[in-house]
Amino acid sequence: MAARRTHERDPIYKIKGLAKDMLDGVFDDLVEKNVLNGDELLKIGESASFILNKAENLVENFLEKTDMAGKIFAGHIANSQEQLSLQFSNDEDDGPQKICTPSSPSESKRKVEDDEMEVNAGLAHESHLMLTAPHGLQSSEVQDTLKLCPRDQFCKIKTERAKEIYPVMEKEGRTRLALIICNKKFDYLFDRDNADTDILNMQELLENLGYSVVLKENLTAQEMETELMQFAGRPEHQSSDSTFLVFMSHGILEGICGVKHRNKKPDVLHDDTIFKIFNNSNCRSLRNKPKILIMQACRGRYNGTIWVSTNKGIATADTDEERVLSCKWNNSITKAHVETDFIAFKSSTPHNISWKVGKTGSLFISKLIDCFKKYCWCYHLEEIFRKVQHSFEVPGELTQMPTIERVSMTRYFYLFPGN
């Protein structure tokens, strides 16, 4: 049996001494400031002594087994103590330092969900086209960053599932565009303070997904319509495979509020206007390509109104006998749906409000970005949207339920980040 070392040479006793001195100082301050009373301090002291004594006994048991085991174990503890000392030294020299720990319990929970997601990615949905990242990718990913899709998986899925997914163009030569319209300052409504957080986070996400972002702020409904028409006419869409349209503003059931909106004189961009500008008749460069609408806005509380889409312009085309016959006999004309490949994801259900919390931005945009970063490497778009909805499933103090609407997508849309 190896002989026990003296207290002066054993790292355990040094660490116990350091811990005791530190805890004594902390407890003195807690009692002095009336944070703890005598009974509470006694209980904590007993617990601390128990931990320290058990740690000593554990090391002594190792020492009794073999001297080598004791050296290994004590060495690890000594190294930990050295790192702790170095951390405190750096803090004293350089001032407060940011320690790399999860910022909240929810962030730690997200990390656990991330790991579970990577293990069980292929079990989520029968219709889901599965991608499984290699173990190295999973273990090397940094929390709160966009997870990338492995190149070999991208090529495999793109080839084997070509008939089930929307075509994804190669990076080289691809000119994806996204539009963000954010109204922050209003003439008659409250300003949307701290909306810059949502803008920056959404812009960063879209750029990381390969989109060049066009940002427009503080527009009337007419100005928004003009910007949409100009964006729809951009030549880059011809060499693009998709687009995102993001709206962040006040809103009512009928649509997005412009900066001059008031009850007596509404200034509203209607959904039908957006869909009409980008439909297959008016925006041919995006025909058969996914068009994703993200809307962060309240949807009003008015009664007697329902959320509908009009069929203006379609009925005539379908019932005009001469036009139909002309299409049949003219080989240069093919029949096409007026509106396809759209999906709208809105921050709340009709008639209900959408919450924005201080400097952290809106709940909906925050959750949306978080789910994109976690899941778009292996899930298709609609599945990601359901992940966002699931995060709102249990009502909290701030209750809302994002809704997926006006879906005319005929295939799965994968973003394949990194490709």
Swiss-Prot record:
Any Gene Ontology CC annotation: endoplasmic reticulum
UniProt entry tagged with the keyword Protease: yes
Signal sequence, start to end: none
A biological-process GO annotation: self proteolysis
This enzyme's EC code(s): 3.4.22.-
Domain CARD: start-end pairs: 1-92
MF GO annotations: cysteine-type endopeptidase activity
Expression across tissues: Mainly expressed in skeletal muscle and lung.
CDD domains: CARD_CASP1-like (cd08325), CASc (cd00032)
Coiled coil spans: none
Residues the record marks as active site: 250, 298
Database matches in PROSITE patterns: CARD (PS50209), CASPASE_CYS (PS01122), CASPASE_HIS (PS01121), CASPASE_P10 (PS50207), CASPASE_P20 (PS50208)
Assembly and oligomerization: Heterotetramer that consists of two anti-parallel arranged heterodimers, each one formed by two subunits (Potential). Interacts with TRAF2 under resting conditions; this interaction is reduced in ER stress conditions.
Known function: Involved in the activation cascade of caspases responsible for apoptosis execution.
Full protein name: Caspase-12
Organism for this UniProt entry: Mus musculus
